[in-house]
From Swiss-Prot:
Catalyzed reactions: [protein]-L-isoaspartate + S-adenosyl-L-methionine = [protein]-L-isoaspartate alpha-methyl ester + S-adenosyl-L-homocysteine
Recorded GO MF terms: protein-L-isoaspartate (D-aspartate) O-methyltransferase activity
Active site location: 69
Keywords for this protein: Cytoplasm, Methyltransferase, S-adenosyl-L-methionine, Transferase
Coiled coil regions in record: none
Function comment: Catalyzes the methyl esterification of L-isoaspartyl residues in peptides and proteins that result from spontaneous decomposition of normal L-aspartyl and L-asparaginyl residues. It plays a role in the repair and/or degradation of damaged proteins.
Subcellular locations according to the entry: Cytoplasm
The protein's name: Protein-L-isoaspartate O-methyltransferase 1
Gene this chain is encoded by: pcm1
Organism listed in the record: Marinobacter nauticus (strain ATCC 700491 / DSM 11845 / VT8) (Marinobacter aquaeolei)
CDD domains associated with the record: AdoMet_MTases (cd02440)
Similarity comment: family membership: Belongs to the methyltransferase superfamily. L-isoaspartyl/D-aspartyl protein methyltransferase family.
One Pfam family here: PCMT
Length: 218
């Protein structure tokens, strides 16, 4: 990372390391995930007015009714995905691009879909700042996935559907894993593993995400 991206004060590497320590104490076990969380400058994915809060373990607004997910949940979902070592990962909900940047450091190919064009444009700029080259972005309804690029052996969903759309399950490769928050008021983080035509579901822990909405915003 450049000196500009390292930041100073509240955005410094030391501040990031304190966040990493909190995540480790909170139950994140993967050293690889924690290393990447410590490297990726979360502050550049926020408006300047909020950048001083970048390394708090909390979700923060990014506009258009969307949020930058809590670092714990970014680390948790990434850790769950990493346990299955997928090579081709589909992310639904690029948002600010922070989760995308984290994924890009751990998996060879990332395909990320965002329905809100201004968010996607800003995410693209930030990923370019970080010289990320293994991510393809698409402006589309995330609930439909990216069928022409599938199947994927990893799918991560960063907004909550009431139920996982069948279209996404169909894009999951045999042996692949899907990590998503599911539900309305009472959401749960789920892990779904495809075994042939059977989908094995594990409910993991309660979460709170913005809902997965259909359509696109230009």
């Amino acid at each position: 990372m450049t000196a500009q991206l390292e930041g100073i004060g509240m955005t410094s590497r030391r501040t990031r390391m304190r966040l990493v320590q909190r995540l480790r104490e909170g139950g994140i076990e993967s050293d690889r995930v924690l290393e990447v969380i410590g490297q990726v400058p979360r502050h550049i994915f926020l408006d300047e007015a909020l950048s001083h809060r970048a390394y708090e373990d909390t979700s923060l607004p990014i506009g258009h009714g969307q949020t930058l997910s809590q670092p714990y949940i970014v680390a948790r979902m990434t850790e769950l995905l990493l346990a299955h070592a997928p090579q081709r990962v589909l992310e639904l909900g690029t948002g600010s691009g922070y989760q995308t940047a984290v994924l890009s450091q751990l998996f060879p190919e990332i395909y990320s879909v965002e329905r809100i064009r201004p968010l996607q444009d800003r995410a693209r700029d930030r990923l370019r700042q970080l010289n990320v080259r293994n991510v393809l972005l698409k402006h589309a309804d995330g609930g439909m996935g990216w069928p022409e690029r599938g199947p994927f052996d990893g799918i991560i969903v960063t907004a909550a559907p009431v139920e996982v759309p069948r279209e996404l399950l169909d894009q999951l490769a045999d042996g692949g894993v899907l990590i998503a928050p599911v539900g309305e008021e009472n959401q749960v983080l789920v892990e779904i593993i495809r075994k042939g035509n059977h989908f094995e579901r594990h409910n993991l822990e309660p979460v709170h995400f913005v809902p997965l909405l259909g359509g696109v915003i230009r």
